[in-house]
Amino acid sequence: MEELIVELRLFLELLDHEYLTSTVREKKAVITNILLRIQSSKGFDVKDHAQKQETANSLPAPPQMPLPEIPQPWLPPDSGPPPLPTSSLPEGYYEEAVPLSPGKAPEYITSNYDSDAMSSSYESYDEEEEDGKGKKTRHQWPSEEASMDLVKDAKICAFLLRKKRFGQWTKLLCVIKDTKLLCYKSSKDQQPQMELPLQGCNITYIPKDSKKKKHELKITQQGTDPLVLAVQSKEQAEQWLKVIKEAYSGCSGPVDSECPPPPSSPVHKAELEKKLSSERPSSDGEGVVENGITTCNGKEQVKRKKSSKSEAKGTVSKVTGKKITKIISLGKKKPSTDEQTSSAEEDVPTCGYLNVLSNSRWRERWCRVKDNKLIFHKDRTDLKTHIVSIPLRGCEVIPGLDSKHPLTFRLLRNGQEVAVLEASSSEDMGRWIGILLAETGSSTDPEALHYDYIDVEMSASVIQTAKQTFCFMNRRVISANPYLGGTSNGYAHPSGTALHYDDVPCINGSLKGKKPPVASNGVTGKGKTLSSQPKKADPAAVVKRTGSNAAQYKYGKNRVEADAKRLQTKEEELLKRKEALRNRLAQLRKERKDLRAAIEVNAGRKPQAILEEKLKQLEEECRQKEAERVSLELELTEVKESLKKALAGGVTLGLAIEPKSGTSSPQSPVFRHRTLENSPISSCDTSDTEGPVPVNSAAVLKKSQAAPGSSPCRGHVLRKAKEWELKNGT
């Protein structure tokens, strides 16, 4: 009986060092109480387990049998646990949490490392180990910390080092609860600095391979940066791997080497191995995955022959042992709560990646708009912490920065630049401009903004997307045709000015009742609207959006009309300047010829010096005019190319504007020999103080389409047929 009690007491002491569930801990407490009652009745000498741990290193082990004749060793009075340090901890301070037991305060193992071991920036190849390094001492935290919620229901907890992006290490309290890894910056924090669901993660153990390296656990999740944690020993790494496997597989059944994925998204083992083998190694201790074991491409290939003998004998070589990796496939990744609620189901998503200019450097940030604030996150998965938050009320949106970054827009407050953002495409830029205009409460029309560094096609896409986004953000409905119905279905601008879209039709049949109809990719006109009342549209004029005429939706009709008109006006001005410059050059050349003749006549006379001075000035003026003529020719060529592109888009859209007779193409029947003044577009009022502006000529186009006898193509064909009859008659 006495031997059984002694062995049972030793067994309970061994259980204090193991990770136990709450049920086992309760049973252990009951057995301990029974054992204490038996020992007190039998007269056994019972000692507290915590006092044994404190005096284990300095005092001999207590006898296993009761020896009453041996005097009891003197024990110092219990002065209570040491207080927490008030000053900041040294750089090499390291703690490891010991598993909790019932009725005890959490214990932590501390050790001190030198500064060289804490940094991975520089590695040493010295293989000598210091004997005094890594000695462990135990201390207990105060009793009021024993009930802290951080580690109450934790499966395992410890202070581990986390590897930062540039190789630095930072200490975190890592706790595993349920199926999540929680990282706290301090044990006094109530909210975790990082929360990582273990489902869908791959955990890799990277052994220590040199003096300056550490035992590392690498946790990789698809779409995120890997999390690298440093542990003290291989045994601790195996404990963490075991607990992580139990934490996830305990919900569905027994612990396996690989947890099966959910049946809704099956992932075969061969596909998983193929996917893992295609990943590029990001650490010195990683390699290519083959049959669940990670092998290294570097040293292992060189020493493979040397290690073959030891492997044949049933042992593992040093290099191979360092590269053994335990990979746990824990199913498909579940989106976090913040990702599920990040406006993914809204009509217009108010989040996305943008390039942000910070300290003269462009950085990609995940941006989202929430509660009239523009919030910048480092990554899409890290939504609980943000870099900066900008209130949008009172801000002004200004597109453009320079020619190198054409898709850039800025946020200004009281004339001061708050943020500089760059989108990845014209649609993305228009979406963000519409969102920011709606959130800032601005009454600015997206087309009233100046897009200085993008062309007509891109600006049309930006403006149209911005208008659509603005209407969605304000819960307004854009009708398929603004000339149908009342003004309540049109685009209602905050300033009260009615803005009309192009008459390019969109599909009404494919739109469901859940979402409001969206206008096509046409561009709205700026300035004055037509004074005529809206009329009922001709159903024959409705164009279905198919592959044959999909190019019509690539441009904004009215914007191209206005741009073509502006380019034609500019071309006329340049041609006039060119003609005037040519006449001036001819006059200067004639004067220069006369001066040279006069100098030859007055050779050796007094007026020769005056004539030579005049000739020098005349030649200088000729050079200036010649340089001006070259610049004018280049500008004229550029304007002609732009006009050609605009007219090509006009042919696609069926515009009313026509090219000049000098630039008309004889192959196209649309290019008729008539001037711009005879076109229907001239009847619209396009006067503005800023110059030519886009106009909305829908009513005029409908009038021209309603008259079948006035078709220019038909008149052209009849005239040609009459000419052929006259030729045949002669």
Curated annotation (Swiss-Prot):
Give the subcellular location. Cytoplasm, Cytoskeleton, Stress fiber
Q: Which residues carry this modification: Phosphothreonine?
A: 675
Give a brief account of the tissues where this protein occurs.
Low expression in normal breast epithelial cell line MCF-10A and in tumorigenic breast cancer cell lines MCF-7, T-47D and ZR-75-1. Highly expressed in the invasive breast cancer cell lines MDA-MB-231 and MDA-MB-435. Overexpressed in prostate carcinoma.
Primary subcellular site in the record, as a coarse category: cytoplasm
Give positions of region: Interaction with F-actin: 594-637
GO MF entry, a single one: actin binding
In Swiss-Prot or TrEMBL terms, this protein is called Actin filament-associated protein 1
| Species of the source | Homo sapiens
User: What gene makes this protein?
Assistant: AFAP1
